[in-house]
Design a protein with these regions (language model features):
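N-terminal interaction/assembly modules
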Residues: 1-104, 108-148
Length: 148
């Protein structure tokens, strides 16, 4: 989260890899999960346009440039986990984002994050959510035959 914040705060002009290396060296020398940190950061970076479009669609009261940088990057992480990471269950992704928001954001950040990502989650089809296997999703034909 801190690496994405710094990268975004500096208008994405700095090298994300260098920021990550510095933060891991400074804050996470003994931390496990370094690969996961890189997966999250690069995943957000590589899908930034799509993720930001989702934020714009679901945070209609807030233009992107008016969303505080902490909130914006917590949303990006949460949406990336929800939409792209199969190993993270959807409700875990939402909860982690809300808790990050409460920890690093302002007084109402947790509620804001929960509102945006929670609304997105409710709108998604099961096959659209990374933590739900496609085999769990039901197609419309299957639903219509189950009703009869």
């Amino acid at each position: 989260m801190q690496s994405l914040f710094e990268w975004d705060f500096n208008e994405r002009k700095e090298n994300l890899e260098e920021i990550l290396k510095n933060h891991i060296q400074e804050f996470g020398k003994e931390a496990q999960g370094e690969e996961f940190v890189y997966e999250l950061a690069y995943g957000v970076r590589d899908n930034l346009a799509a993720i930001d479009e989702i934020i714009i669609k679901h945070a209609t009261e807030w233009p992107m440039d008016q969303i505080p940088p902490v909130d914006r990057n917590v949303l990006r992480l949460g949406i990336f986990e929800l939409m792209f990471l199969k190993q993270v269950p959807p409700k875990v992704a939402i909860n982690e984002a809300v808790e990050l928001g409460k920890t690093f954001g302002g007084e109402s950040t947790g509620k804001f994050i929960n509102g945006v990502i929670g609304t997105l989650y409710k709108e998604l089809e099961p096959a659209d959510i990374a933590g739900v296997e496609n085999s769990e999703a039901k197609d419309p034909e299957q639903l219509s035959t189950e009703k009869t």
